[in-house]
């Protein structure tokens, strides 16, 4: 699903709070491909934008975008930044190339949406709850054992269906 960023924006302004958007799954996949803030027309209203280069961009690493005060604080206080190494030029180049493709070839997003629509229709036809809002299709199995068995079955059929288990999800919702 897509976070109700319009409502979160209103709340952030009402309570004088910073608005942070983690777009791990939205970059290159929803709306124009520019992420959740762009989807809602709130690009200029987000205080902290973070995301990954590893999902739709096919690279590694991530990013944080914010004003200079916030970035300076993170550079000096964030242990995960202080004790890590910079991305390699090849990884940055791969992410930039993917961004260039997304910007220059709008058919990529069109093909993705066609695939999302097809997948949603197929899941619904099998009696599995699905929506075509995003290209992520959580399918709740239940127990860890059953979920791992389904994941193994899919893998042997040539399909990557990662088993998400506790503590990532609540017990019984694998």
Give the ranges of each region predicted by the language model.
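Active-site core of PLP-dependent enzymes with the aminotransferase class I/II
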Residues: 1-15, 31, 146-147
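Short, hinge-like loop/turn segments at secondary-structure boundaries
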Residues: 6-8, 36-39, 101, 149, ...
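Active-site cofactor/substrate anionic-group-binding motifs, chiefly glycine-
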Residues: 11, 20-21, 27, 160-163
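Active-site C-terminal subdomain of aminotransferase-like
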Residues: 15-18, 25, 29-133
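Short secondary-structure boundary/hinge segments and terminal tails
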Residues: 28-30, 92, 140-141, 171-173
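Conserved PLP-binding catalytic core of the aspartate aminotransferase-like
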Residues: 110-117, 124-157, 173
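Conserved PLP cofactor-binding pocket of PLP-dependent enzymes
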Residues: 157-174
